[in-house]
């Protein structure tokens, strides 16, 4: 459950998704995640690095093999999410 706790934190999945697209430094990653504060980004990067999902090399964050495996494991959820959004207009009931 610790992994689900980490992934449920605000911006964690977005960071993983962005780094799956390509490695990025802190400022570039903050630019890609437009509304994320630098303090939240710093915290999430530390948590994801501590969980061995990311590493920092040559001033760029990138997914580790564990991080790549995680993103691949989440692919079916991403596909389901796209179908759900198409069918519902992306609006949650409430």
Please tell me what each predicted stretch does.
Residues 56:
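Short beta-strand "wing" residues that participate in macromolecule-binding interfaces
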Residues 1-40, 51-53, 62-68, 94:
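N-terminal helix-turn-helix DNA-binding core of bacterial DNA-binding proteins
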Residues 45-46:
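Short, hydrophobic-biased segments on the C-terminal half of alpha helices
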Residues 62, 71-94:
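Amphipathic alpha-helical dimerization/coiled-coil segments
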